[in-house]
Amino acid sequence: MSSYFVNSTFPVTLASGQESFLGQLPLYSSGYADPLRHYPAPYGPGPGQDKGFAASSYYPPAGGGYGRAAPCDYGPAPAFYREKDAACALSGADEPPPFHPEPRKSDCAQDKSVFGETEEQKCSTPVYPWMQRMNSCNSSSFGPSGRRGRQTYTRYQTLELEKEFHYNRYLTRRRRIEIAHALCLTERQIKIWFQNRRMKWKKESKLLSASQLSAEEEEEKPAE
């Protein structure tokens, strides 16, 4: 036994007036913390202490646990919640019928008539000169069969093109662009006009040469 620890069984005698202070000093007989019976513990009385003071009611029981506590009984549920649970169970059991969307042709046609122009409105729409295609006598460049209409030229445009063809049978791209800007035509229109004019010129030259040959032959026959 170590001399540093005081044996609690050994009687301790103190002077008069100091015996009341003895109960307030914790004396230990061994290395374990074992307070005297007069010293109150912070977590309730121990098994060997005096039970003069009752334990507080808010301390948890010694052997109780949170998982072992009995469930609280709140009494029967009100009628409102019981009816609500029954209605939810019935609604969950019944499955809604499948939804089959039907096309609404009348609405589609109505939307087209509202946001788009109908055939009658297109026909009745006035066509102003600035809305027409440049250098075209017809309001539309396509015929009733869907083919592109024949391009017509004014007298001034035809005269200028004939002058240019008289000097040059074939045009360079630079010259073709200049003529197109001067006559307010496209480069493609100038190119097509010259192609057609060359075909016509070849045909006329063939007819002219054939007529000259026939005339020469007629002149040679009487001479024979």
From Swiss-Prot:
GO molecular-function terms, A-Z: DNA-binding transcription factor activity, RNA polymerase II-specific; sequence-specific double-stranded DNA binding
Subcellular localization, as worded in the UniProt entry: Nucleus
Transmembrane segments: none
Listed GO biological process terms: anterior/posterior pattern specification; embryonic skeletal system development; embryonic skeletal system morphogenesis; erythrocyte homeostasis
Main location: nucleus
Motif extent (Antp-type hexapeptide): 127-132
GO cellular component: nucleus
Role: Sequence-specific transcription factor which is part of a developmental regulatory system that provides cells with specific positional identities on the anterior-posterior axis.
Name of the protein described by the UniProt record: Homeobox protein Hox-B6
Gene: Hoxb6
